[in-house]
């Protein structure tokens, strides 16, 4: 799906009167590398109602590997989706912000009110870094339900945010999106890479230079693991084609 198609789908889901919600994931090199070694995480991603190509290298890999379905690989970047959904929101779209710090959430809410006047933020929650207890999760569900939200933006970091959007869709009639760093980018607390770096697949270098402590493991382990997985899949596809 293209960016526009993804945005339209999210906006439509918000109005569906169904008992269960929808989950949207954004797959990048680290996501795929992590899923290859964590079966529970892989199941969470695969259970998503929509999984978008968040990273340019993922798009390249999709185009390089044989695809019997003839898919059209496009980058659908989490921050771009969040921005576009906010821009196209009406009074009926009610947004809830889950994740990050209280300061960042306050900045983000103010930016949304300033830049997207039609987007209504009905609640926000900055949970503790540790895993939430069952009681805390139940109380979180109640807060979201009481707010009337139909779109929940989740920025808890990978992999926690992907598990959370799956949990939310099973509990509430909301569309939950695991958008990660979009909170920081839109709030202005972390600078975003220039467009040319995003298109060239070098955005990770920019982000690493800005947050080396947090992102070193992600890139030093995740990127090589992703490349290894792609090459292994390519070789396996070639062997299969030769045998046939």
Q: Residue spans of the language-model regions?
A:
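A short, gly/pro- and small-residue-rich
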Residues: 39, 43-47, 162-181
């Amino acid at each position: 799906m293209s960016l526009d198609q993804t945005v339209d789908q999210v906006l439509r889901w918000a109005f569906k009167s169904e008992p269960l919600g929808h989950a949207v994931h954004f797959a990048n090199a680290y996501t795929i590398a992590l899923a290859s070694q964590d079966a529970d995480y892989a199941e969470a991603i695969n259970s998503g109602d929509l999984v978008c190509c968040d990273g340019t290298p993922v798009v390249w890999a999709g185009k390089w590997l044989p695809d019997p379905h003839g898919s059209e690989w496009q980058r659908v970047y989490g921050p771009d989706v969040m921005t576009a959904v906010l821009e196209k929101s009406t009074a009926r779209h009610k947004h809830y912000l889950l994740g990050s710090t209280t300061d960042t959430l306050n900045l983000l809410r103010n930016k949304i009110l300033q830049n997207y006047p039609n987007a209504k933020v009905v609640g926000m929650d900055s949970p503790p870094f540790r895993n939430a207890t069952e009681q805390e999760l139940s109380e979180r569900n109640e807060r979201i339900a009481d707010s009337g939200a139909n779109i929940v933006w989740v920025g808890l970091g990978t992999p926690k945010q992907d598990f959370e959007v799956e949990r939310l869709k099973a509990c509430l009639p909301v569309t939950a999106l695991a958008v990660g760093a979009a909170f920081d980018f839109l709030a202005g607390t972390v600078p975003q890479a220039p467009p040319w770096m995003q298109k060239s697949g070098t955005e990770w270098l920019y982000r690493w230079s800005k947050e080396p402590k947090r992102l070193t493991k992600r890139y030093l382990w995740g990127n090589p693991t992703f490349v290894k997985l792609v090459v292994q899949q390519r070789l396996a596809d070639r062997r299969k084609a030769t045998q046939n």
